[in-house]
Every structure is written in C-alpha cells, then in structure tokens.
C-alpha cells in the first residue's frame, strides 16, 4: 500500500474543516493530515488534534495574488513531503476526493493501484454539488452532506490535479500542475461543496474581507448556477460520468493545453444513493 498524505489551507471555515479532517483522517490517519491556517488570528480547533497544524501570517493581496502565494506555500511543502510519502492529496477545505463505492475499494487502495508511469499527478472528475433550491432545504450540519444533496454539475473547473506523486508546482487552487498534463482516472471523483447550501454562500457574500479581496464575481457566479440548476435536465450518473471522463481526457482549451474542456456542455447528474454516507 502506498503511503499517502493530504494537505489543505483554511481560514474561517470550522464546519468544512471538521468534515475534511473526519473524512481524510478516517482514510489516511490524522497523523498524515497537514493543515495550514491562513492568519495568525485563527484558532486551531479540537477536530485537528493529531494532525500537523501551522498558523501562517495572513496571505495578503487580491484573490488572484493571494491564491498564487498560498499554492506556492503548499507546493513547496508537498515537495518536501514527497521525500516521505508516495502521494500527496491537495484540496481546498470544501473538496473531497472520493472513490466510487461500486468499486469496493478505499481511497488508499484505489490510488495504490493507479499506474503513474509518465505522470506527475492524478486527477479526479470534478463533481460540483449544488443545492436544488426548489427541492432541497438547508443543510443539517449534523448529518452526512451527501445524504441531503442529490444533484451536481460535472465541472471541468473541479477536475483538478489533486494528487501529486512527483515534486512539481501546483497552479492556483490545485487546478493544474505547471508541468504536465491531466491524468483523469475513471471511478475517482472530486466532490466540491461550495454551492451545496444557499445560506452558506450568503454568509460568504456578506463577508467584507472576501469582498475586498475580489471574491464577489466568483460568488455571484455560484449563486447564478444555483438558481439555474432546477431548470436544467438531470442526466444519469453512470452514463455521463463516463462520457465526461472521456471528453475531458481528450479536449483542451486552445489557450490552455493543460486544462480540460467539455465543449461547453452543462451536464447535471443525480448522485447515486451509494455515495450518501461518505461525507
């Protein structure tokens, strides 16, 4: 079995930090989780006991500049970890790399079986979980998230180079590596929960600090997608996840050869019940 670690950086998000440490800790062991806090004003919560934690000086700048500074910190740290680990999973705090339960393998078992010859990273198909505001109420924070959310968009934005096996530089937000193509693996998904609850999104939109750093445009796009989702047709998961992997493995933007594309398709799928207890 390959030795695998996970790392992230967080600021003012205790809810998803708790979910992140519980999910990856159960799979990898909390001693293999590395958590950076963006700002020395942050409090390290009890849920991170047993993990490596570090308070960093606040990363300054607008959203683009600060994202680049943060990913540079984590890329350098991941390169050092690869002297002791075979793979490093890097995600935002609201992202979870999940193996299809139908395969009957844990995340470490699945990744240990991936042929990495010629690649520096592994990518999971991006699954942007979105609240259907006509059918789904606000999240109960004490229950599994996927037991309360059934719809998602298959998104190239969240098909990220999330798993490193060589010491290379991540692009901002883990979206790519700066040297190398995508290696998208069927049966592996990155679930993103930034659009999973309208009230959570509203809190971010009201956050003065995020607004001053230029997050408004991105957050308004999320809200627009949440309003559009109930009007889009819902496709079958097993059919369209396979098609999405095929498309994203082959199609690239002409201006960014190492970013996957999907011909502008907006594919909404229903998440199968087999995922409901995982996060």
Model-derived features with residue positions:
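Cell-envelope/extracellular polymer assembly enzymes that use nucleotide-activated donors
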Residues: 3-5
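Active-site beta-to-alpha loop of glycosyltransferases that engages the nucleotide-sugar donor
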Residues: 8-19, 39
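Short, hydrophobic/aromatic alpha-helical segments in well-folded domains
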Residues: 20-23, 73-77, 109-110
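Short, acidic, metal-binding catalytic loop of nucleotide-sugar glycosyltransferases
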Residues: 22-31
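Short, high-confidence coil segments that cap the C-terminus of an alpha-helix
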Residues: 30, 85, 116-119
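Short internal beta-strands
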Residues: 34-37
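Active-site-proximal specificity loops/subdomain of glycosyltransferases
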Residues: 41-91, 98-102
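Catalytic-site signature of metal-activated, phosphate-bearing donor transferases
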Residues: 67-72, 101-279
